[in-house]
Structure formats: structure tokens, C-alpha cells
């Protein structure tokens, strides 16, 4: 007979381990165990049967894989945690003995990252383990940037030391400098949560959130210890990424940092970038003893001859490009672009490549901006520099690093204002004109001729659309256009607020709206015709009514049929047939009258627009009916499972179409009301 297996040596009891057992096995504290699991990417598991997985009688809630805990036993940081734990025990024993001098000596050797922001251990090897390639690190950079930008804007507290905040801010500014140099920033969006940014680095789209620079109130219900563990890991990760990015574009990392300028809130201006020659084209330097050796004249002549032969095709291409007109160049360029069309009629719309007339990296290169005091200086400066602007000025209150602090500088072309327009008082103009040479700040509401005044949204809309928008739409006090998210992907059939309404409407939808408006117009015309009835005929009717006793005797007899008609709504088909019979009888009577009088019957003139609309409506209805019949025939050939799936798809598509149609109807109503308002 085989031996009886002991309980807890096989199955789920062997594969899973509780958190208490894991902490006891690693011989570290619970906070250190949490840190280690976060850094190594180990998270709790849920066994199928908790009773079988638990070796004790008590109900355990948190389980881990036994292999994961076994893997943590070989981690280098565990030794540092054990040393710290032993040091904490020595400090507590010294305090218990009353030896304050020995406790202070041991405290100086202890690691306090929550106070100093420095640790005795290194996370470099963990970064290399979790991200074997640089692309893997870029893919996981979204949460890293969002967390570090959040901590860079927090106030310093006991749980969030000032050194940690300064380290986060420094890493974020270094990353922004790379985006400015490499022109990698693509889009940005203003939301309630903060400002979203999207950059493309080595083909990877990175999206992160930056909070607005308001005074933050730190509450006690947030566990900053866990967040601080993530920040400690993300600081090391972003340091690796920044080093790799800087070296890829030929810059020295870390860049020079001016602490004095940073104390004056210079921001990006506190860093000075230096190139180390990587990626730069330089002439090779020859090391000699002081006398430069002259090249062989024969060898030099042969080299020059070969260079002329190599450069001949390039010169011919330049000459042909100069002789050809610009229009032909554009046609040739556009013909070389491939157009990607969806394989199926209901497929998603693919992004089409196109030649842009303006380079996004030089969108603001020709302008000089001045930022008013009420505008978000840090975000505007970053976006403007990332899209080619070199000259940005702001008020001295906003900090150092500006191109100019003089608001009346004549070189300023655009001024960003985020305040309501104020009326200029003419009495104070003379006093300010006298001291115009020394004044650096204009009074509120004053404007300089020749300068464009815009609201901050103009900059965001320009970079998202990769073109300069009309500045008059974003003037101070103007009703701003809707600020739409640039991260939404276009899907066929979905409502697109940026596209014209005519391009999104279905043919039958537009015809239905037109027919509805025509019916309303006909009803209004009938009402006006009744109101404008001839008074003579009205008098005749009244006189005849007075002469007849049956018609004018009882008002109740007249009201009774009306009430009956209102209450009863049946026999609709019978009423329609009666109406058709009345129209046929009237037409027959007109034909007889025309035949007796010997005059040809005059047909009513039909409006060609109405006829075209009715024909198109019939055609659309016929097409929809054919599509429904084709769908029903195809469903008959399907199995029950596939038929159910198809019905779910059709239902969801109809629901989406109904939502899009409701949004289009709302937009159509708004546009019509906007067009009709000026006429009144």
C-alpha cells in the first residue's frame, strides 16, 4: 500500500501561501514586504478553494503563489531590509535601557527615506528585470509620468518630504526638455482633472495627466506610504528613460541645473542643455605633432573627380525641380501617397497619410508670445517651446526665465489673455502715455495696436489641428468654439462633432427632416388661410345660419360630434380610403365641368424639388426594404448560435445609430436656431 499523504503537502495548500507565512519566511516587516511586492510586480492570488489552500483553521484572506515568495528569497534588497530591521531592534533596545547617546548614534546609521528621500538600496537591477527592452519601459511610462507630475505639484508634508517633491519636479522638467528638443509632443487637452499630453517616442504613444497648479489640500484618507513606494520605483525608471533619450539625441545627461534660478521659479529655464557630439556631424580631428601634413595632390584630384561624378545626379534633380512649376510638384507628391480604404463597407475609418503644408515643430516659430499673469505659465511655456517658439515673455510675478518682462515690447506679436475685456478710460490715457518709455506693465484693458490678443484655448486648438486657427474666434470675451478631445478615434457611423453635419447624415434622414419641416409649413399656411378668410363669404355663412333653425338651434349638438371624434381614434384605414374617394370624386367633377365648358383641364404644376425629394424618399425606402429582406434571407441560412450573435450585433448597431441620430438632430436644431436668430 502507498503511504498516506500528509495534509498541506500537495495541491492548493502547496501552491499557495498566506501573507503572514510569507512575511515570516522572508524575515522582513509587513511594510517592507508590501514594497518588495510592488517593485517586483507580485500581487495576491485568489485560490479556487480557500479552505483547501489555508493550512490553519482561521480564515485567511490574502494568498500568494509559493513560487513567487520563493523567488523573493534571492532578492538583494531583502538583505538591506533585514539589516534595517535589525538596526531598528537595536535602537529600541537602546531606548529601553535609557541610553540616548547610543540610540542617536544608531539612528544616524538608519535609513529614513520618508524624511531624507534617500535610500541605502538600489532599484536598478529591478528595472532591468521588469523591462528587458527600452520599448517595454516606454509602454509603461504613462502611469509613471502621471504619478511623478502629481507629486511634483504636491505640498511637502511629513509623509511627502520636500526632497522627494524636488526630485520628481527635476525628472519631469528633464523629460519636458527632451520633448522640446526632439519635437515629440503631439496633442494636448484641457479637462476637469487636469491637462492631458500625448507624445510619440520611437513609435510609442505616451499619454499622461498633469494637474493644474492650484494650492492642494492633502487629506488624511490617502495612504501616501503606498504611493511613495510607487514614486520611488518610478523615479528610478524615469531616470533610466531620460538617460537613454538624452543620449539618443546627442545630449549630456544629466543637464546642468541652476539652483538659484530654480528658487526663482524659472522652471525649464533652470536647465542648460549640452551636446556631447553624439548625432552631430563634425569634421574628424587629426592629431599631429604641430605640423599639418598636406594631402597628396594626385590623390586629392582623383577624390574630387569621384565626388563630382557622385553629385552630378543630385544637381540634375535640383535643376529639374527648379524648372518645374509648383503645381506639378504638388500633384506628383500627392499621387505618391497611398490611400487606405476599409475592406468592408462597415469597417473602421483608417488614418490617411497626407502632406502638411506647415511643419508642426515650427508652428509658432515666427511669433513672440507674452503670457499675462492670469494664464497657466508652465503649461503654455512647455507647449509653445515644443512647437517651435523661441521667444516667450511673461510678467515678472510669474518667475524668471522669460524672453522679456516688458509687456509693451514692440517685438511681441501675440498676447495670451484669460480675463474679461475691460473698457479703457480715456482720462487716464494721457498720464500713461507720458511715462510710456519706463512703464513695463500696462493698465488693465489697455491694448497695443498691431498685437493679436487671444485666449489660451487658441494654442491648444492650434496644436491639436496642426494649423493656425483664426484668432478672432478666440479674442478676449468671445464665445469660444467647443474644445474637443483629440484622442477620440473616429468610427464609422458614430457622431463626429468636428465633421460637417451634411457628411454624417443619411439620405433618408435628411429627407425625413425636410418632409417634417414642409408639413409644419403647410399646417401654418392653412391656419393663416383660415384667419385671412374673405369677410363677405363669412357674412353669407352667418346669414344662412340664422335663417336655418336646425343648424343654429343647439350648440350642444355641434359640440357632441367633436368630442366623439376626439375620444375615438379608430377606423384610420377607412378614413384614408374615404379621403382618397373624395379626391377622386373631386377630380371627376372637375373633368366633367371642363368637358361641358369646352376648356382643357389644367393640371396642377408640381414643384421639381418636391418631386425629386419624393422620388429620393421612395428610392431610399425601397433600398432599406431590400436590405432588410436580404438580411432575413441570410439569417435563414445561419445556425441558431450565429443568428443570436447577429441579432445582438444588429441591436447594438441600431442603438448606436439612434444615439448618433439624436445628437445630429440636436445639432441640426441648434444650427437652425443660430441661423434664424440674426434674421429676427
From Swiss-Prot:
It comes from Sclerotinia sclerotiorum (strain ATCC 18683 / 1980 / Ss-1). Component of the NOP7 complex, composed of erb1, nop7 and ytm1. The complex is held together by erb1, which interacts with nop7 via its N-terminal domain and with ytm1 via a high-affinity interaction between the seven-bladed beta-propeller domains of the 2 proteins. The NOP7 complex associates with the 66S pre-ribosome. CDD domains: BRCT_pescadillo_like. The gene is nop7. One of its GO terms (biological process) is maturation of LSU-rRNA from tricistronic rRNA transcript (SSU-rRNA, 5.8S rRNA, LSU-rRNA). Keywords: Coiled coil, Nucleus, Ribosome biogenesis, rRNA processing. It holds the Pfam family Pescadillo_N. Residues 505-527, 540-559, 573-582 have a biased composition (Acidic residues). Gene3D superfamilies: BRCT domain (3.40.50.10190). Residues 602-626, 654-664, 671-680 have a biased composition (Basic and acidic residues). Its main location: nucleus. It is found in: Nucleus, Nucleolus; Nucleus, Nucleoplasm. GO terms for cellular component: nucleoplasm; PeBoW complex; preribosome, large subunit precursor. This is Pescadillo homolog.
